A protein has these predicted regions:
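Catalytic phosphate/metal-binding cores of nucleic-acid and nucleotide-processing enzymes, i.e., regions
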Residues: 10-13, 38, 63-69
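Short beta-strand/loop segment that forms part of the nucleotide-sugar
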Residues: 30-38, 60-62, 88
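Internal alpha-helical transmembrane segments
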Residues: 85-86, 90-91
Length: 187
């Protein structure tokens, strides 16, 4: 698939630690829509610097209305029909990018990528953390996200053709025990 025909949708809030690496992995896509939720760190500066170099990023802003609703709002800003939804703490591996380029998608295709969840930079291969498949590529005229406030996911219609990629996203999930406890308490 031509990556220029895919809009990448990213939600961000205070993502300065991972955003540059995330965006760099997405530079070949036709459009990146970044939906900011009141970042107070250098997130927007990083995004603007990226856009100066690649000219394919658009910044929108919204209050927090729940993750499902925010992701659907972000998708609504996308100019392309095909969507790659990625989190600001995820990085698309080169092998996964090559696999996406080789796809021949029909409108009813929904694509899952495995995530390599990382703890303090190390890949967690046990405890059900890999493969952690997440539905991330879809045609916005076919489906979208559920409206869950947290733990949102792409709705999979019965007539969807499901495709699982062999390659993955690196997910910088947590970097300390403190961040694990913070996430557990938040969600």
């Amino acid at each position: 698939m031509d990556t220029k025909k895919i809009s990448v949708c990213i939600l961000v809030k205070n993502a300065q630690n991972t955003l540059a690496q995330c965006l760099e992995s997405l530079r070949e896509f036709g459009e990146i829509v970044l939906l900011d939720n009141n970042s107070t760190d250098k997130t927007l500066q990083i995004a603007q610097e990226f856009n100066t170099a690649y000219k394919n990023l658009r910044i929108e802003k919204s209050e927090f209305i729940g993750f499902g609703a925010l992701k659907n709002l972000c998708v609504s800003y996308a100019k392309n029909e095909w969507i790659l939804s990625i989190d600001s703490d995820e990085v698309l591996e080169n092998e996964a990018l090559s696999e996406i380029k080789a796809l021949d998608l029909k409108q009813n295709c929904v694509v899952a990528l495995g995530r390599k969840n990382l703890y303090d930079g190390e890949w967690i291969k046990a405890c059900g953390w890999y493969p952690d498949f997440v539905w991330r590529i879809f045609n916005k005229n076919f489906t979208g996200f559920n409206d869950n406030f947290v733990h949102e996911s792409v709705k999979i219609p019965q007539n969807a053709e499901k495709i699982y990629l062999k390659n993955a996203l690196k997910h910088y999930a947590v970097n300390s025990m403190e961040s694990i406890i913070t996430k557990m308490n938040r969600y």
